[in-house]
From Swiss-Prot:
Originating organism: Halalkalibacterium halodurans (strain ATCC BAA-125 / DSM 18197 / FERM 7344 / JCM 9153 / C-125) (Bacillus halodurans)
Protein name: ATP phosphoribosyltransferase regulatory subunit
Cellular compartments annotated: Cytoplasm
Keyword presence, Acyltransferase: no
Additional free-text comment from the UniProt record: This function is generally fulfilled by the C-terminal part of HisG, which is missing in some bacteria such as this one.
Assigned protein family: Belongs to the class-II aminoacyl-tRNA synthetase family. HisZ subfamily.
Pathway entry: Amino-acid biosynthesis; L-histidine biosynthesis; L-histidine from 5-phospho-alpha-D-ribose 1-diphosphate: step 1/9
BP-aspect Gene Ontology terms: histidyl-tRNA aminoacylation; L-histidine biosynthetic process
GO MF: catalytic activity, acting on a protein; histidine-tRNA ligase activity; transferase activity
HAMAP family: HisZ
Top-level taxon: Bacteria
Length: 397
C-alpha cells in the first residue's frame, strides 16, 4: 500500500463542513425535540464495544466490522449499529428498570466498505427503541413517531413501506420447503432484484401453481387491498398471523392520522437478520435509497439474558439532509462580521456583546489579521466596519 497524501482520509470517512454541520444540527435538534415530546429518553453508548458481545450479536456482517485490540488483548469493534449496544445497556445498566422502556439516541456508526462501493464507512443515525411491548400499538407508535419526526425536520414528501418478516418467511418456506432455497429468494428481495427473482423462480422445479404464488408475491404492494390479496397466497398459520398483525397495525396508524404516509410492501426484506415481525423503510422525495428503516426484533434481548419484545427505527441523517434539498428549515442565525482596527477595539467588542445578547451571531475580526478584506467580507451576510478614529457601519475615518 502506498503512503497516503497528507490531505487524504481513510476510505469511506467524510469531513463535515460548516454549512452542512449547521443544517444537520438544526435537523437533529428538531427531530430530538419531537422525540422528547413522545416521552423517549436520550442515551449514549461507547464508540467501542467488545467484539464478543455487541460485535457477535450485531446483524452487520463480520467483514464490515472495524476491529482493533486493546492493551489486554481483547478484540474491540467500532459500534456497527445502535440496536445491539442499546440491548446490552438495557440488560446491564438498566436491568432494574421496569418495561416498557422508551429510549432514543443520536450517534455515529461504523461499517467498513469496499473500495468500489461508494458508501460511507461512518454515518450518523438518530432513532428510538421501544423495549418491552409486543403489541401492535408499539409498532404503530414508533412508525407514527418516525413520520412525525420527519415532518418536524421539514420533510413533506415521503412514504413508509411496511412489510412483515413472518409473512415472507412463511410463504417462501411453504412453497420451496427448505431454508437454503428460501434464503436464495430472500436475497433477491433484499437486493430488490425482481428480474433475478423472476428468473430464479422460473428455474425452480415447482408446480405451475406454486410458481404463480411466488410470482404474485411481487404484486403485493399498496393499501389495505394488498393485505386481502396476500391472504390468497398463504396457507400456513404463521402467514395468517402476520397478516392479522399488519391489519391491526394499519388500524393503529389510522388512529394516529398517519395512514396517508404508509403503504404495504409484502416483498420487503431488510438486511438486519434479527428482525422478527413488522419491518419498514422510509423513502424521501427524489431519493432512490431508504433514508430510515426499522422493525420488530423480539429475540435480540434474550442474547443479553434479559428477554423482551422490542421495536424501533433509525434515520440516516446524511440521507435526510439530501432528501430535504431545499426544504431545510432555516436556523435563523446568519452571521455578521465586525471588522475593527486597534483603536476601535473596545467599541467593536461592546457592539458585538450587545448583538450577541440579542441572539445575533457575530464574528469579531481584527483588520490586522486580514489580507483580503473583499474576499473575507463575502463570507458574511453583513459587515460592520469599526476602523479609524471616527464612524462605523461602513464609514472609514
Amino acid at each position: 500500500m502506498s503512503k497516503p497524501f497528507m490531505f487524504e482520509k481513510p476510505f469511506g470517512m467524510r469531513d463535515t463542513l460548516p454549512e452542512w454541520y449547521k443544517t444537520k444540527k438544526n435537523i437533529c435538534d428538531q427531530m430530538t425535540e419531537e422525540i422528547n415530546l413522545w416521552g423517549y429518553d436520550m442515551i449514549e453508548t461507547p464508540t467501542l464495544e467488545y467484539y464478543e458481545t455487541v460485535g457477535v450479536v450485531s446483524a452487520i456482517l463480520d467483514q464490515q466490522l472495524f476491529k482493533l485490540l486493546d492493551q489486554q488483548g481483547n478484540t474491540l469493534v467500532l459500534r456497527p449499529d445502535m440496536t445491539a449496544p442499546i440491548a446490552r445497556l438495557v440488560a446491564s445498566s438498566l436491568k432494574d428498570r421496569a418495561y416498557p422502556l422508551r429510549l432514543a439516541y443520536q450517534s455515529n456508526v461504523y461499517r467498513a466498505q469496499q473500495n468500489e462501493g461508494g458508501k460511507p464507512a461512518e454515518f450518523e443515525q438518530l432513532g428510538v427503541e421501544l423495549i418491552g411491548d409486543g403489541t401492535a400499538s408499539a409498532d404503530g407508535e414508533v412508525i407514527a413517531l418516525m413520520i412525525a419526526a420527519l415532518k418536524r425536520a421539514g420533510l413533506s414528501e415521503f412514504k413508509v413501506a411496511i412489510g412483515h418478516v413472518g409473512y415472507v418467511n412463511a410463504l417462501l418456506m411453504d412453497v420451496v420447503g427448505n431454508e437454503q432455497r428460501a434464503d436464495r429468494l430472500r436475497r433477491f428481495l433484499y437486493e430488490k432484484n425482481y428480474v433475478g427473482y423472476r428468473e430464479h423462480v422460473k428455474s425452480l422445479n415447482l408446480s405451475t401453481i406454486d410458481k404463480s404464488r411466488l410470482m404474485n408475491l411481487l404484486s403485493l404492494r399498496g393499501g389495505r387491498a394488498a393485505i386481502e390479496e396476500a391472504r390468497g397466497l398463504i396457507q400456513t398459520e404463521k402467514g395468517k398471523t402476520a397478516l392479522a398483525e399488519m391489519t391491526k397495525l394499519y388500524e393503529v396508524l389510522e388512529s394516529y392520522g398517519a395512514s396517508e404516509y404508509v403503504k404495504f410492501d409484502l416483498t420487503l426484506v431488510l438486511h438486519m437478520s434479527y428482525y422478527t415481525g413488522v419491518v419498514f423503510e422510509g423513502y424521501g422525495n427524489r431519493l432512490g435509497v431508504p433514508l430510515c428503516s426499522g422493525g420488530r426484533y423480539d429475540e435480540l434481548l434474550s442474547k443479553f439474558h434479559r428477554p423482551a419484545q422490542a421495536t424501533g427505527f433509525g434515520v440516516r441523517i446524511d440521507l435526510l439532509v439530501e432528501a430535504l434539498n431545499g426544504e431545510i428549515i432555516s436556523n435563523g442565525h446568519e452571521q455578521t462580521c465586525i471588522l475593527f482596527s486597534n483603536e476601535r477595539r473596545f467599541e467593536a467588542i461592546e457592539l458585538a456583546r450587545k448583538k450577541r445578547a440579542n441572539g445575533e451571531a457575530v464574528v469579531l475580526q481584527d483588520l490586522a489579521g486580514v489580507t483580503d478584506v473583499d474576499a473575507m467580507s463575502s463570507n458574511y451576510q453583513d459587515v460592520i466596519y469599526c476602523i479609524g478614529t471616527a464612524g462605523r457601519g461602513g464609514e472609514d475615518a
